Every structure is written in C-alpha cells, then in structure tokens.
Swiss-Prot record:
Assembly and binders: Component of the spliceosome where it is associated with snRNP U1.
One Gene Ontology term of the molecular function aspect: U1 snRNA binding
Residues covered by the RRM domain: 26-105, 174-247
PANTHER family: RNA RECOGNITION MOTIF-CONTAINING
Keywords: mRNA processing, mRNA splicing, Nucleus, Repeat, Ribonucleoprotein, RNA-binding, Spliceosome
SMART domains: RRM (SM00360)
Gene: usp102
Coiled coil: none
Annotated region described as Disordered, given as residue ranges: 1-25, 113-157
Physiological role: Involved in nuclear mRNA splicing.
Compositional bias (Basic and acidic residues): 114-134
Record-level GO cellular component terms: nucleolus; nucleus; U1 snRNP; U2-type prespliceosome
Organism: Schizosaccharomyces pombe (strain 972 / ATCC 24843) (Fission yeast)
Protein name: U1 small nuclear ribonucleoprotein usp102
InterPro entries on file: Nucleotide-bd_a/b_plait_sf, RBD_domain_sf, RRM_dom
Amino acid sequence: MDPQTNSHQEVQQPSPKETDSQTPSETLYIRNIEEKIRLTMLKRILEHLFGSYGKVIDVQARKTLRMRGQAFVVFDNLENASRALKDLQGYPLYGKPMMIQYSKSKSDIIVQRESPEEIETRKKDRKNRREMLKRTSALQPAAPKPTHKKPVPKRNVGAERKSTINEDLLPPNKVLLLQNIPQEVNADVLTQIFEAFSGFQEVRMVPGRRGIAFVEYDSDREATVAKNGTTGMSLSGNQIKVTFARKAS
C-alpha cells in the first residue's frame, strides 16, 4: 500500500527498477494490473490465484493515484512466495502480464509475528509522515472551481428503463450472460475472474458473436453470488454487463 498514507498493515512499495538480486520476502509486489478492475474483485482474484501456491494471509490494493494498477500479496512463508513469483511472473491477468517483485520491506503481519516491538515504531513513523503531509497540503492554494458546466447529453430514458426492467424480471439462473466484453478478453481471462466464486463450472464464448459469453455454475444460488460480485466490473475500459441468462422454455 501507499507508504505515505496507509496506516494498517502497510508495506513499502519497491521501485520498478529493482532486479532479481533483491532480498527475498514473504510479501510480493505486483504491478501492471488492469486499473479498471473493482478493488473487491481484484483482491478476490489475487487471493485465489496466488493461494494455489500456499497460504495467503493478506492482499493489499488501493485505488489511490499512486497505487493504481498495483497490489501486495503476503504469504505465510518465504518458500511459497518465491514459488509464486517464479511461476506467475508475466502471467496474463485480465489480458495484461503481471510484473512481480519481492517487496522492499515486510508487511506488518510478518513483522508482528517476527518482531512485535517494531510495530509501534512503524506506527509512530507513519503518523509523523501523515502529519507532515497535512501541514504541507494546508500551505497549497486551492484549485479554482470551474465557472461553467458542460452540457449534459440527452438520454433515451424510456428505452433504458425498458431494458433494465426486462433484465430485472429475469429469474435467477445457474447460467450468467456476459455482454460488452472487449475483443482482447478471452475465455481464459474470464475464467480467472469467475472461478473465484464457488460452484464455477465453465465459461462459454459465443462463436461468431463478439462481446458475449456465458458462465455456468452448479446452482442458481452460486450464480447469484457471482453476479452480485461482478456487477459493475470493467475490463480494458469496458463495463461488463452481467445478467441471468434466459432459461430454456
């Protein structure tokens, strides 16, 4: 997380120029992540993906300007972290290759376990930095407010309302319909997202129809959980439309 602002279980962000000679750590720093992904979804996917290499005890990510497209994954031991770094280096997450390094400093969770007395020192240092930043910000002049408003384009409210009502009336189904999928997003990318939810069966792309796919689960209930967890999700700048598929009559 951002070492200047985070006050809970923070780790220091390593420089992108760090090399493999960096000191190994239980905490991995990941960058080049798709920035449009919802934070809750990103954490779930990273926990699921890295969890296949061992116990993940924390996943840290923020939407602040400094931390966009980045995250930290904390393992319970160094061996698992090293295997994950080696195997997942360059792994295409949401169509973008992950760039993974050891974090320059250990997470608070690891420090608490190995050297509890250091935690209070860390907290004091962060508090001092936050207070200094506040004092510095107070000296900066406020940006002038805009004096004009941009015209709001007209919307076809009737058509939008009709479409929304029709989708809301669809009963729960173990199969989800995905629409507005970017061309570069394939079945493997969608699988990475939706297999994080219990009961996942498969992703089926629709041949000859771009931007559409189906995701099947074991039950209506599990599909509902996945639908709620991915509503509003964006990939490569496109907001993905997730609804229940129509049941065969």
